[in-house]
Swiss-Prot record:
Keywords: Ribonucleoprotein, Ribosomal protein. GO terms for cellular component: ribonucleoprotein complex; ribosome. Belongs to the bacterial ribosomal protein bL31 family. Type B subfamily. The keyword NAD does not apply. Gene3D superfamilies: Ribosomal protein L31. Part of the 50S ribosomal subunit. SUPFAM superfamilies: L28p-like. It comes from Stenotrophomonas maltophilia (strain R551-3). The lineage of its organism: Bacteria, Pseudomonadati, Pseudomonadota, Gammaproteobacteria, Lysobacterales. It comes from the Bacteria. One of its GO terms (biological process) is translation. This is Large ribosomal subunit protein bL31B.
């Protein structure tokens, strides 16, 4: 195998900002943000808008998650 062509596989914390859910797992995602985890170590932090903790399919609850105003823009454009 060639040297130095594979991404860095490391421990990363994913933070679902919608439900404030955090999980420590391994990933190749790169980020400049870090967070202090429960074990006292600092880990890279990746923020996500939706995960299984907030997705309606997994939670069984229907809720509208509009982070960029697309619903308001659509309703304004096609209002009668």
């Amino acid at each position: 195998m060639k040297a130095d062509i594979h991404p860095n596989y490391r421990d990363v914390v994913f933070h679902d900002v919608t439900s404030d859910f955090k999980i420590l797992t391994r990933s190749t995602m790169s980020t400049k943000e870090t967070i202090k985890w429960e074990d006292g170590n600092d880990y890279p932090l990746v923020k996500v808008e939706i995960s299984s903790a907030s997705h309606p399919f997994y939670t069984g609850k229907h809720k509208v998650i509009d982070t960029s105003g697309r619903i308001d823009k659509f309703q304004k454009r096609y209002a009668r």
